[in-house]
Amino acid sequence: LNERWLVSVLEEGRNGGILHFEGLPSEAAQYIIGSLEGSMMMARSHGGMARFDAATRRLLADFGI
């Protein structure tokens, strides 16, 4: 995942009224990438996707999706 690409997607989404979040798009991108990477590691070490699924649902909710 390219962080610069994600920042531009977040900026466009916010400007278009599709995404809703506080703070800088660059910080939001770091939050998203870190959350997904951590969730993937936890899912792998715990033998299931439940933690990853929960994290992705939360991320979507955090951005109003």
Show where each model-derived region lies.
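Amphipathic alpha-helical packing segments from all-alpha helical-bundle domains
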Residues: 1-15, 27, 64
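Residues within alpha-helical segments
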Residues: 3, 14, 29-30, 40, ...
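Generic detection of well-ordered alpha-helical segments
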Residues: 4-8, 30, 34, 57, ...
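Amphipathic C-terminal alpha-helical segment
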Residues: 12, 33-50, 62-65
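All-alpha amphipathic helical-bundle segments outside canonical DNA-binding/catalytic cores
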Residues: 15-31
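Short, hydrophobic secondary-structure boundary micro-motifs
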Residues: 18-23, 44, 51-53
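Short, charged alpha-helical segments
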Residues: 27, 50-58
